[in-house]
Structures are given as C-alpha cells and as structure tokens.
Curated annotation (Swiss-Prot):
GO molecular function terms noted in the UniProt entry: serine-type carboxypeptidase activity
Protein name according to UniProt: Serine carboxypeptidase ctsa-4.1
Active site: S169, D380, H441
Originating organism: Caenorhabditis elegans
The protein's Enzyme Commission number: 3.4.16.5
Protein family: Belongs to the peptidase S10 family.
InterPro entries per record: AB_hydrolase_fold (IPR029058), Peptidase_S10 (IPR001563), Ser_caboxypep_his_AS (IPR033124), Ser_caboxypep_ser_AS (IPR018202)
The keyword Hydrolase appears for this protein: yes
Keyword Glycoprotein (UniProt): yes
Record's signal peptide: 1-19
Top enzyme class: hydrolase
Length: 470
C-alpha cells in the first residue's frame, strides 16, 4: 500500500509538471454572459532579463490536446494584441460600456489554441523592470522568441504541436523576423507550419507608392492633381513611380501630401465604414496611422476633432473593461502596473524601425518550405492590398494556374447561399495572396465569418472556399 501511495504521488507530480500552470488559469472572468467550454490562461512570459510580456491563451473548444497552437500579434508598433482578442478573433467580446462579455461565434479558438501576446514590453499589460522601452525590430523578434520559449516551459504539452504565427498591420514585420528565428530552432519548434499576415506592413515605401493611384481610382483625388503629379513628378507614369521619394522633393512634396490627405474625413482603415464618430473614443486607429507615417519620415495627418475614431469600433468598451479592478485581478495583473492602454505612446515614439522591407525574411521562409498566407481587406488604405500584391510579385515567384487569368474568386457560405468573399492568387513556394471583399484593415473584425473560414482552411490545407462546420 505504501508503494502504491508513493507511485500515485509520483504520477500526480509528473502529470502536474506536464500541465498548464494552475496559477495562470482564469477561473472567473467578470461580466461573462455565457459559460466557456474551454480553458483560458493569463499571465507573464519572461522575454529578457528585465522584460515580461503578458499573454492570454484561449485553448481550443474542439480538441485542445490535438489542435494546433496559433500565435496572434497585433502591430502598431506599440498596440496590444488584446485588441485582437476582444475586438477581432477571440472568443470574448465586450459590450454594454465594459460591463458584459458575449461569445464571438467566429472565434479562431473553435479550431485552434490561440495565444495572444502583448508585445513589446510597455504595451498593454507587458512591462520592463528598468522602464527602458526603446526597442528595435530585431530586439522585438528576439524578445518574442524568448517569450515563446518561456511559454513552452510553462505549457510543455504544446512542445512539438503544429505551430502557426498570425497577426496584422505592423506584425507584417514582427512575424517574418520572428519566423526566421523559429526556423533556426527545430529542437523547440519541430512542427512550425507557417504564417498568416493580414494587411501587413511588408514594404513601407511601396505602401505610399501605391496609395495615390489607389485613392485616385476610388475617386478621392481630382484629375488635375493626379495628372499634375504624373506629369511633374512621375514622368507621366504613376504606375512605376517612386512616389515615396517625392516626399523629399520640394517640387512634389505638397502635391503628394494633398493627394494622400484626401481621406481626412474618412476612416482610412475602412473607406466605406459607416459609423457615427465620437472624439472622446480611444485613439488606437489614429495611433497606428501615425506610427506608419513616422516610420518613413512623413508628417502626421490632420484630423478634424469629430472624425478621429468610430465609437462602433468598440475600442472604448475594451479600454473600460480591461481597466476594471476585478478584471485585472482575474487576469493576474499586478496592481502596481499602470492602466491598460490599447497603444503605448512611449513605445511608439521610441521604437526603432530597421526593417522597411521584409523580402529577405520572406525568401528564408519560402526556402524553408513553410506555408505563407498574405491577406488584405480591399478597402484598407493604411496597408493597402496593391502594396502587398506588388510585394509578392517582387519575389519573382511563379503564379500557379492560368497566367493571363484574372485573380480567382473565393467564396464563403452566407445566410443566403454562397457569396464572393474576395479574390486569390497562388504562387509556387506555398505562398497565397487573398483579398477580403469589403473589409478594411482589421479583417477579423470587419469580416469575422470570412476570416474564420479563411484561416481554418489555410491551416488545414483546404481550398479557401470550403465551407466549415464548427
């Protein structure tokens, strides 16, 4: 009997060592209006000697011990991935002025274990013990990699699991630079399968090269201004013009800025967004735009006070909810930390951009044979679809299918039958480019059903038009 008792203690201890950390488990999330059929965890991962990144893991509601691990990163640089969780692809969405949590039926954790990581230190609930928040692209990729190693030590059951990295916006830099590090660590990540980048900042200068024609063909720039830029700045060919360089040409600078400021009265993250505006709403989206322009040395746009960020983006609800004392306690957030903010001005202002173009990282990923999905909402102007299509074309990959054919439609199953979700181009090297019709910068927020189907089919190697039942 004594031997059996000792054996039981040993087995129990061994099982505990292989299990998720009980101290990080979220047992009571305030405001829930449903009972989750999955476990979720919130805590900290050590990213460097003085840097600790907050994570929130939402395990799969389908088969958590078998489904893949999917990392999600928001961009900025300097914005929190909890926005991705609460406003986009996570299972918990906030309403009623931060008082209630309702279930997102299009959550990605219906088929994957989704890890939301607030990066870099200083963003959201993440922190640095020495208060130095100046980081570069390469340092962020290193810190994210080290945080993932710490995650595997906390959750050893995920070691060897199929692993995917996803995200949007400035994560177009975070993801490729992190992927290169992961590819060099087969020991800890033997089943790294691929990446999915939404509306990514893959080539900063070309984003601005493509914005003037994008605006023009959306009837936002007058013929006389467009023709003036073409004639006097672009040798009569805007299609191949390095418009970005014209920002530094005194004869063209004002013309180009006037063209790009044509959307001042619109939501540049979704040109067709219809919403009442509230000047008191948190300025996350204005922050992202400012960071993108600062990164390439452009002046910040001027916004009218009443047209900054739409209230219906739910950002204010998120901010209110995550700063509730009972919510912070449930998520195991130290009381000594300051209030949660969607985007950190301090991180943004001190951020050092070193990767203006991620072609080398893409070439490394392609050579390694992992799957790559680049997707874009087609009415986003912050990181527009033409920029990313041209970025992939610059890789000189073979287009699969009929060379002269227009991009092929992909479909989703809607309430009234099958509908066009967007268009797709497939390249040799396991590279896919998809547009999401009618979506802006935040695809899982604007088109949740389409994005869920797209990602499910991507990681399961199915045709993007395949209907899903979850």
């Amino acid at each position: 009997m004594k031997l059996l008792s000792i054996l039981f203690i040993f087995v129990s201890s061994y099982s505990f060592c292989l299990a998720a950390p009980a101290t990080d488990k979220v047992n009571d999330l305030p405001g829930l209006t449903f009972t989750p059929d999955f476990f979720h965890y919130s805590g900290y991962l050590r990213a460097w000697t003085d840097k600790y990144l907050h994570y929130w893991l939402t395990e799969s509601s389908r088969a958590p011990t078998q489904d893949p691990l999917v990392l999600w990163l928001n961009g900025g640089p300097g914005c929190s991935s909890l926005d991705g969780l609460i406003e986009e692809l996570g299972p918990f969405h906030v309403k009623d002025f931060g008082n209630s949590i309702y279930y997102n039926e299009y959550a990605w954790n219906k088929f994957a274990n989704v890890l939301f990581l607030e990066s870099p230190a200083g963003v959201g609930y993440s922190y640095s013990t020495n208060f130095n928040l100046t980081v570069s692209d390469d340092e962020v990729s290193l810190h994210n990699y080290m945080a993932l190693l710490d995650f595997l030590s906390k959750f050893p059951e995920y070691k060897g699991r199929d692993f995917w990295i996803t995200g949007e916006s400035y994560a177009g830099v975070y993801i490729p630079t992190l992927a290169v590090r992961i590819l060099n660590d087969k020991k800890n990540f033997p089943n790294f399968k691929g990446v999915a980048i939404g509306n990514g900042a893959l080539n900063f200068p070309n984003n601005y090269n493509t914005m003037v024609p994008f605006y023009y063909y959306h009837a936002l720039v007058r013929d006389d201004l467009y023709n003036d830029i073409a004639r006097n700045c672009c040798n009569n060919n805007i299609g191949t013009c390095d418009i970005y360089s014209k920002f530094f040409d005194p004869n063209c600078r004002d013309k180009v800025i006037n063209a790009l400021d044509g959307t001042n009265e619109l939501n540049m993250y979704n040109l067709y967004d219809v919403c009442y505006y509230n000047p008191t709403t948190n300025l996350k989206k204005a922050f992202i735009e400012r960071q993108m322009r600062i990164a390439v040395g452009l002046p910040a746009r001027k916004h009218n006070a009443a047209t900054t960020v739409p209230l219906c983006a739910q950002t204010n609800n998120t901010h209110v909810y995550l700063n509730r004392a009972d919510v912070r306690k449930s998520l195991h957030i130290p009381s000594s930390l300051p209030a949660w903010e969607e985007c950190s001005d301090q991180v943004g202002k001190n951020y050092v951009v070193t990767h203006f173009n991620v072609i080398p990282e893409f070439q490394t990923m392609i050579a390694a044979g992992i799957k790559i999905l680049v997707y874009n909402g087609d009415v986003d102007t912050a990181c527009n679809s033409i920029m990313n299509q041209q970025f992939l074309t610059s890789l000189n990959l073979t287009v699969l299918g009929e060379q002269e054919k227009v991009n092929e439609a992909w479909h989703y199953s809607g309430q009234t039958g099958t509908a066009v979700a967007g268009f797709q181009t497939k390249f040799a090297g396991n590279v896919d480019f998809l547009t999401v019709r009618g979506s802006g910068h935040f695809v899982p927020e604007d088109k949740p059903k389409e994005s869920q189907q797209m990602i499910f089919n991507f990681i399961n190697n199915k045709d993007y038009s395949t209907p899903i039942q979850l």
